[in-house]
Amino acid sequence: MSAGLDQETGVRITARQLGASRQAPAVARQFTRGFLADMGASTWCQQAGELMASELVTNALVHAESAARLWISVADGIARIEVTDDGPGDPVLRDPGPAGGYGLWLTDMLAQSWGVIPAAGDRGKTVWFTISLSGSRQFTSRLVS
């Protein structure tokens, strides 16, 4: 898997446009895990990163009814993973229930930090999270307002 390198900042970047199909979460998992592995991430970071990316892509498909764009950057041992969609409204962190609600909840528990960037206009947003490449298991709320 190849990544771009910003020569000025040393940030490694890769992105993938995902279709609005049932295969998108699986593609996101494979893409995320592969890139994190190429960057030397710990097994835990690879697993947690692919899980959170998959959940956020699933949220885009289910709630935004939109294709998603997955963007990953790595700098100074930290990966930032973003999922952008064209759906209206912001996601809401809630307690999971029998019918779902695990996406943001898992992200809140596993990520170092996370947040939402509204798009200009009435539709669209980017949900992002950060995770340490050398990270290990951690369970704490990390929402950045």
Positions of PLM-derived features:
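Short, solvent-exposed helix-to-loop capping segments enriched in aromatics
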Residues: 55-59
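Conserved short strand/loop->alpha-helix "switch" segment adjacent to the catalytic nucleotide/phosphoryl-transfer site
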Residues: 26-54
